[in-house]
Amino acid sequence: MGIRLKAHGKINLTLDVLDRRPDGYHEVEMIMQSISLHDVLEIEEQSKEISLTVSGISVTAEEDNLVLKAARLLQQVAGTGAGAKIHLQKNIPVAAGLAGGSTDAAATLKGLNALWGLGLSQEQLRQLATQLGADVPFCLAGGTAIARGIGEKLTTLEPAPPFGIILVKPSFGVSTAEVYQGLRLEHLGKRPNTEAMVKALKERDLGQVARELANVLESVTLRMHPKLEQIKEILRQIGCTGVLMSGSGPTVFGLTENREKAAELISGLPQAGCHVLAAWMV
């Protein structure tokens, strides 16, 4: 008997970088939001071996895939001889700022904990998730949350309204490490106001949510890839209420009042050289 799980992507409604730590990581404060766009993992038990196959968007099934890393970490920590055959249907663009790899790792931890009957608590899984990447703990929890530390310290918020989202992922990827290297903490632009964004979400005020969108990494990635500014402008022109880059990029998203509006507006968007999708907050 196998298990089938959805692994939802995320966007950042705010992203602030507070400090650089001695270990090279950065202290952040950000509001993260799960979105309807998701990968699908199908997991079946087999003896000892862990194998991975992938369909959909092309990604490596080699050892550096976070699905395999998560499975092997759980296998090692649990001391189990059980294995798993994992199939990943990849729908979330890679190197996009949408946590595509992180959410697959989180779903793997969740799925194998159930399949192998390990009985690990959510907190135990969260500690393992932190070892796999800064976005993995949020992806494990999902929903709407403030993330602090390197992203592992989560404060769950009330679920956000199901605002519509248009996602535009250019053909190029972006290295998160390079973006952070290009960040100058003394020269940050608009800083997010976390409290104001939380209030806007609670009041379901799309206009105010749009005004509070802020990501201090955006200016760095825009310098590297000026085309992103053009994409932002097009999203504004077709009627998106607010526009921002997610994570370290390069995906840019536009907000609308609901999923139907996102689907309607997307028809007016030129798609040349970009991966364009309509989604909503979940």
Curated annotation (Swiss-Prot):
* Entry-linked Pfam families: GHMP_kinases_C, GHMP_kinases_N
- Species of provenance: Desulforamulus reducens (strain ATCC BAA-1160 / DSM 100696 / MI-1)
Q: Which residues form a coiled coil?
A: none
GO terms assigned for molecular function:
4-(cytidine 5'-diphospho)-2-C-methyl-D-erythritol kinase activity; ATP binding
Task: Kindly state which keywords UniProt assigns to this record, in alphabetical order.
Answer: ATP-binding, Isoprene biosynthesis, Kinase, Nucleotide-binding, Transferase
- Protein's job: Catalyzes the phosphorylation of the position 2 hydroxy group of 4-diphosphocytidyl-2C-methyl-D-erythritol.
Residues annotated to bind ATP: P93, V94, A95, A96, G97, L98, A99, G100, G101, S102, T103
Pathway(s) per entry: Isoprenoid biosynthesis; isopentenyl diphosphate biosynthesis via DXP pathway; isopentenyl diphosphate from 1-deoxy-D-xylulose 5-phosphate: step 3/6
Q: What is its EC number?
A: 2.7.1.148
The entry sums up its family as follows:
Belongs to the GHMP kinase family. IspE subfamily.
Q: Which reaction does it catalyse?
A: 4-CDP-2-C-methyl-D-erythritol + ATP = 4-CDP-2-C-methyl-D-erythritol 2-phosphate + ADP + H(+)
Q: Which NCBIfam families match?
A: ispE, PRK14608.1
Asked if the Swiss-Prot or TrEMBL record annotates the protein with the keyword Hydrolase, the reply is no
Which BP terms does GO give this entry? Answer: isopentenyl diphosphate biosynthetic process, methylerythritol 4-phosphate pathway; terpenoid biosynthetic process
What is the name attached to this protein's record? 4-diphosphocytidyl-2-C-methyl-D-erythritol kinase
Cross-referenced InterPro entries? GHMP_kinase_C_dom, GHMP_kinase_C_sf, GHMP_kinase_N_dom, IspE, Ribosomal_Su5_D2-typ_SF, Ribsml_uS5_D2-typ_fold_subgr
Top enzyme category: transferase
**SUPFAM superfamilies, sorted:** GHMP Kinase, C-terminal domain (SSF55060), Ribosomal protein S5 domain 2-like (SSF54211)
Task: Give the Gene3D superfamilies listed for this entry.
Answer: 3.30.230.10, GHMP kinase, C-terminal domain
Q: Which residues form the active site?
A: K10, D135
